[in-house]
UniProtKB/Swiss-Prot annotation:
Segment forming the signal sequence: none
Name of this protein: Mediator of RNA polymerase II transcription subunit 13
Gene Ontology biological process terms in this record: negative regulation of cell-cell adhesion; positive regulation of transcription by RNA polymerase II
GO CC terms, sorted: mediator complex; nucleus
GO molecular function: transcription coactivator activity
InterPro entries recorded: Med13_C, Mediator_complx_sub13, MID_MedPIWI
Organism: Schizosaccharomyces pombe (strain 972 / ATCC 24843)
Keywords: Activator, Nucleus, Repressor, Transcription, Transcription regulation
Subunit structure: Component of the srb8-11 complex which consists of rb8, srb9(TRAP240), srb10 and srb11. The srb8-11 complex associates with the Mediator complex thereby blocking association with RNA polymerase II and leading to reduced transcriptional activation by Mediator.
Organism classification: Eukaryota, Fungi, Dikarya, Ascomycota, Taphrinomycotina
């Protein structure tokens, strides 16, 4: 099979709104079946072709290239016809396609999933559909490297477009200018208006992985609209956004241009009006005068205050900028064009028209014949500025024209002026005489050094050097000079040097390395949900260059420079948020419980139930016999007057508070449901509240969480008081919750006298947030440790890092308290009741420790009226956290009893630091660990806990132990690898019936590439007929793929005998493309205390001892927790039909005490071991549900609106194991 595909002489990259300097005015591409792919692409410089026809002037963010081609039928008419059919189907799709031989490869941006921090790979198949395989693995890179490179550029352009559109970024000379800042940026805290310029970078990592991140440049620009006296800035060189042109400010008042408003709106997304302020400017390259919106004019200067009179004399060097075609980087005085103006006037009278025919188009420049400002336009709906004239000789200057396989057919191109798309410079509205073009023979070119520097500053991948043969330059004739323009839109051969800071402070090393920005630049899975994936926790930029100048420290706060969260994404303007968040004490209150812990404490009990519960939980996997002797030291004293809420708030305000929950250390798998953090208020608030409250009140239902409550009770009753006479009838739901994954955050560290972003954060990190936004607060600090001799030097070194970073972020000062207590790091006693010591070691520690009464006395006598911060350095253990919080509460209570009313709650703060923060690979070989210390001064409060308005907090409870990536890493590999035991794809056919009226079926493949849903009304047909239609749809889909398939049919709800017989007798057609096996089962929901008690006694799955039905297989069942089981029917006819599945949120309902359970039963398993099939189903369910929560995209293998979460601990442990055989219960 052989045929030729001829892409006729024309491929153009559309003028993207953010990279005006990267234009391809004309090019061409031809691919013969006997020409190697890489050779053809390197030769012509065009990689991927989209066959979407140019139908609109609107920029399409999902399509990069446009092409016109025709299929030349040579040897095979059918193949050419097939390709044409594909072209017709894809004509109106936002795709990028590539034709080779008889294959048509399609890149579809809509189909690419958005999975931050996870991996997904894909390959283009001959069907044109997506299938995530190994496109970017090393063995494929040799052949598909060009496709790969261009695809990366497509990703980059898409991300750039949406940054500009959604976040009000402004493209300026090929880089980005973030304009959306905190609302107080312009009015409250800042007295300078510098905007750091960032560059979107992409890098190619090992195994074909790619990553995006924002990188700082040395440029800082200032909005001309924020200059108080514009008259003083006349004749000042400015930069025009988004074109990037250099211009001179000639007038502070000018008429608006409707043409410019329209162009900026449709091509750049700027919603401007003609009523906004406009200024008159003159292009430096051509002396063309016109008007421009004031808010899109910028000054380029060093970090000086705007009221500095020497501003114009401190302009930064612009030689490193990438300039568009109509700009040259040398300033010309207006007097230079006096004679040209006279000549232009004569030519205007003669009414000349000049045409020039090029390799791909005929460009006609037509001047206006009126006294109004001149319009230069091409003879089409498009227009071009007067400075543009294409030179065909320069277009092909870098390669031999005689070797060009297209030049012999150049007359057949059929390209017209309409194929060119230039930005229209506005009409000149100033009252000055216009200058007509004067085509002289003079030519001005950029120096080679400038060109090279310009290329080196481009935002490209540093690792791919495959385009040496692409034409680097094209010369464009302007009115009296020739401008050399960079013509390499891919820029893949460029190495990006490390950016060094231009630092004015002599105390800061000028060669200091500035790490890359950590940027959650999300890749769009759909147009509407581009940035919804990181509507929490995402930090898109932070002005590190500004942090390096001392002037900025006087009024700088990181909080004022970070993009906001949910509200900002849906709005072009910032929504003022109240960052002063108070505790809601009622959140942890209950009408059934008093506010004082001591009132409910059992005076006869020798054990503090709070620590008792945690000791049980943290040791449940080690031994059934527990030593409770240490708990004796934690009895709450009757003299404590502070209530339960104070202790709870102290715990929840700490980084480590998650570890006080029983499920923290019990989860060992990698299935971290990070998206569940967003749903905190919906399913976790009440369990945590109940759990902590009941433990504080001594109720046993929150204590007995082990697998065998009876054995635990037995061990308790052997020598200790039982907390409850009756064993619990149910297992508390606290253990069923999963671990959390924290949103990405920017890390700041102070190292080598420079505050910068840390791109290599370790696993252990902390967040420090001591006051609301916009406040500066000083603290007197006490450093306390339960092991002061061992941690003293490390703690002081750590504190100094925090102190310097805190001060340089202009948050205030942290002063190591100089009081009558001389120890720099004090020990604190974990034995609250020091009169009743039980251990010699504890006694020794207590004798040398600083008691809470002593600390309270020092605070009252020496620090009255000041803010005091207690730094507790603790072992990485929940027990120590609770002791430190209890110690802090005792200090507050003692201060209160001493009668000092000057200390308010906000004046006393606690911060717990785990000793594990000092752990590092080199910690055993060095005495100083400050170099390895990573401190997160995360004052941009976007904790998901705070999203719910009912929970107000001043400090967020950040997750401590969580790795943090330095960049957003798109690892293009599969999130759901094929089962090593099976090796086939799985198609999940899941259906359910709503009463007896409606059947809903959903098809998903295990890789999330195929998903569809159909509804069948059972009034019109029997259920067997509906199942037969489902089977036909299934086989139709299977027959379209050349691969082996496992078909998994699962019903939600009990399966009737008629349904079972249908599936048991189902015949798999023999004419399918691959081998197909069938597995059939059902999922059922169980409710009630009786069923929940079985959960912790069941092994991950069990097999019944009896053979069921027709002896086809054993019935396998598995019990798992359900977060939500509901089937809302979107059809009006069935709105009143109650669903068969109950809705449950882990017993959050006040009136319900049961847990909803899900049993998965396998009835039929043809051609596969049923236990391996159950293993496969569980893995698919877990991973696909995980994807659904992470991406807001329904990749669930259950029908839509059924979100099943398998939370059980044994289940997750089973998923990480290699169990392949059943265990009978």
């Amino acid at each position: 099979m052989s045929y030729q595909v001829c892409f006729k002489k024309y491929v153009k990259m559309r003028q993207w709104p953010h990279v005006l300097s990267l234009r391809v005015y004309a090019s061409y591409f031809l691919l013969y079946n006997n020409l190697p792919l890489s050779s053809a692409m390197v030769h012509d410089g065009v990689h991927l072709i989209s066959i979407k026809t140019i139908l609109t002037d609107q920029p399409c963010p999902n399509t990069i290239y446009y092409a016109k081609y025709q299929v030349q039928r040579k040897d095979n008419e059918d193949a050419a016809s097939l390709l044409e059919d594909k072209e017709a189907y894809l004509r109106n799709q936002d795709c990028i396609v590539h034709a080779k031989n008889d294959l048509l490869f399609v890149y579809d941006f809509q189909a690419i999933p958005s999975i931050p921090e996870e991996s997904s790979s894909f390959m283009l198949l001959n069907s044109g559909a997506f299938s995530r395989l190994a496109l970017f693995q090393k063995d494929e890179l040799a052949l598909l490297l060009d496709l790969y490179i261009n695809f990366l550029q497509g990703l980059k352009k898409t991300v750039l477009y949406w940054l500009c559109k959604e976040y009000n970024f402004v493209p300026i000379y090929g880089v980005l200018l973030p304009l959306k800042l905190h609302p107080s940026f312009d009015t409250q805290l800042w007295n300078i208006y510098g905007y750091p310029v960032v560059d979107l970078q992409l890098s190619v990592l090992s195994k074909g992985h790619i990553e995006f991140y924002l990188k700082p440049t040395r440029q800082t620009v200032y909005r001309l609209s924020e200059v108080d006296n514009l008259v003083k800035k006349l004749d000042t060189v400015i930069r025009l956004a988004p074109t990037g042109c250099l211009a001179t400010l000639t007038s502070v008042h000018a008429n608006a241009s409707a043409q410019t408003v329209d162009a900026l709106k449709h091509r750049y997304g700027f919603s401007l009006t003609t009523t906004s302020k406009w200024v008159g400017v003159t292009l430096e390259s051509s002396a063309l005068e016109f008007s421009w919106p004031l808010e899109l004019c910028f000054l380029e200067t060093s970090a000086l205050r705007m009221n500095d009179d020497s501003l114009s004399s401190n302009l930064t060097d612009l030689n490193n900028l990438v300039l568009p075609s109509n700009v040259v980087n040398n300033k010309k005085e207006l007097t230079e064009f006096a004679n040209e103006e006279a000549e232009a006037s004569d030519k205007r009278k003669e009414g000349f028209t000049e045409k020039e025919e090029t390799a791909d188009a005929v460009v006609t420049l037509v001047p206006s014949h009126s006294s109004s400002p001149v319009n230069y336009s091409i003879n089409s709906a498009k227009s071009t500025p007067a400075s543009i004239k294409v030179n065909e000789e320069i277009l092909v200057a870098d390669h031999n024209v005689s070797d060009d396989i297209l030049m012999e057919e150049i007359d057949d191109v059929g390209i017209t002026e309409a194929d060119f798309d230039y930005f229209d410079l506005p009409n000149v509205e100033e009252k000055v005489e216009m200058i007509e073009p004067n085509f002289a023979n003079t030519m001005t070119t950029l120096d080679n050094e400038e060109i090279n520097t310009s290329i080196s500053q481009s935002n490209t991948s540093p690792n791919l050097n495959t385009h040496e043969n692409i034409p680097k330059q094209m010369e464009i004739q302007s009115d009296d000079r020739m401008v050399t323009e960079d013509l390499n839109p891919y820029n893949v051969e460029v190495d990006i040097p490390e950016i060094s800071l231009n630092i004015s402070d002599s105390k800061i090393p000028t060669s200091a390395y500035m790490p890359s920005y950590y940027s959650a630049v999300i890749f769009p899975s759909s147009i509407s949900s581009i940035f919804q994936k990181y509507n929490y926790g995402g930090k898109y930029w932070c002005p590190s260059p500004s942090l390096s100048t001392e002037d900025l420290f006087e009024s700088f706060s990181v909080a004022e420079s970070v993009t906001s969260t949910d509200e900002d994404i849906c709005s072009t303007n910032f929504i003022q948020q109240d960052f002063t968040m108070e505790y809601n004490h009622d959140f942890f209150s209950s009408s059934k419980t008093p506010t004082n812990i001591s009132e409910q404490s059992n005076p006869d009990s020798n054990y503090d139930t709070l620590s008792l519960a945690h000791q049980v939980l943290m040791n449940e996997s080690k031994s059934a016999n527990f030593d409770f002797s240490f708990l004796k030291s934690l009895d709450l004293q009757p003299t404590i007057t502070l209530g339960k809420n104070d202790l709870l708030n102290a715990i929840l305000s700490q980084n480590l508070w998650f570890r006080s929950l029983p499920f923290w250390k019990s989860m060992t798998t990698s299935f971290m449901m990070s998206q569940d953090v967003l749903n905190f208020s919906s399913y976790m608030r009440k369990p945590i509240r109940d759990y902590l409250e009941k433990i504080l009140l001594g109720e046993s239902s929150a204590v007995f969480l082990s697998k065998s409550p009876e054995n635990y009770l037995s061990s308790i009753n052997n020598g200790h008081h039982a907390l409850n006479d009756n064993p619990p009838s149910q297992v508390n739901f606290s253990e069923t919750l999963v671990n959390f994954s924290q949103p990405p955050r920017v890390l700041l560290k102070y190292n080598e006298k420079k505050l910068s972003l840390d791109s290599s954060a370790p696993e252990n990190w902390i967040s420090l947030c001591l006051q609301p936004y916009g406040e500066s607060k000083d603290f007197e600090v006490f450093l306390l440790s339960s092991k002061s001799p061992d941690v003293s030097s490390k703690a002081i070194s750590f504190f100094y890092d925090v102190q310097l970073a805190y001060e340089n972020c202009k948050l205030g000062k942290l002063n190591l308290s100089e009081t009558s207590i001389n120890e720099r790091v004090m020990g604190f006693s974990t034995n609250i009741n020091e009169t009743d010591n039980y251990d010699d070691n504890e006694t020794t520690q207590s004798d040398t420790a600083t008691s809470y009464e002593q600390l309270a006395s020092v605070c009252v006598n020496e620090l009255s009226g000041k803010n005091v911060l207690f730094f507790y350095f603790l072992e990485d253990d929940s027990e120590k956290l609770l002791k430190a919080c209890q110690h802090f509460i005792c200090v507050k209570d003692s201060i209160k009893r001493l009668g000092d009313n000057k200390f308010e709650d906000k004046s006393l703060r606690i911060c717990t630091i785990p000793n594990s923060i000092f752990d590092s690979p080199n910690s055993h070989t060095t005495n100083s660990n400050s170099f390895f210390t990573k401190v997160s001064l995360d004052i941009y409060n976007n904790d998901p806990l705070l999203m719910d308005g009912s929970l107000k907090r001043r400090e967020p409870a950040f997750l401590l132990k969580k790795p943090l990536l330095s960049t957003l890493n798109y690892q293009l590999k599969d999130i759901n690898p094929r089962s090593s035991a099976l090796g086939e794809y799985a198609l999940h056919v899941t259906y359910t019936t709503v009463e007896e009226h409606l059947l809903i079926c959903n098809w998903n493949d295990s890789y999330g590439e195929f998903e569809t849903e159909r509804r069948y009304f059972l009034q019109d047909l029997e259920i067997e007929d509906a199942l037969q239609q489902i089977l036909e749809v299934t086989f139709t889909f299977l027959n379209s793929m050349h691969m082996d398939w496992i078909v998994i049919v699962m019903k939600i709800g009990e399966m009737s005998d008629a349904e079972y017989l249908f599936w048991d007798q189902a015949i798999i057609p023999e004419n399918l493309q691959g081998n197909v096996s069938l597995t059939v089962g059902y999922c059922s929901a169980e409710h009630g205390p009786g069923s929940t008690s079985k959960v912790f006694s069941r092994i991950p799955y069990s097999a019944s001892s009896t053979v069921i039905r027709n002896n086809s297989s054993h019935e396998l069942s598995l019990v798992a927790f359900i977060r939500e089981m509901a089937m809302p029917v979107p059809n009006d006819e069935f709105k009143k039909i109650s669903t068969i599945l109950a809705r449950g949120y882990l017993a959050l309902d006040e009136d319900e005490s049961y847990l909803p359970l899900l049993s998965i039963h396998l009835l039929i398993s043809r051609n596969h071991d049923p236990y391996l099939m159950l293993n496969l189903i569980l893995k698919h369910y877990l991973s696909m549900i995980y994807l659904q929560f992470r991406t807001y995209v329904s990749f669930s293998s259950l029908p839509l609106h059924i979100s099943t979460v398998l939370y059980q601990k044994q289940l997750l442990q089973f998923m990480a194991s290699d169990i392949t055989h059943p265990v009978t219960s």
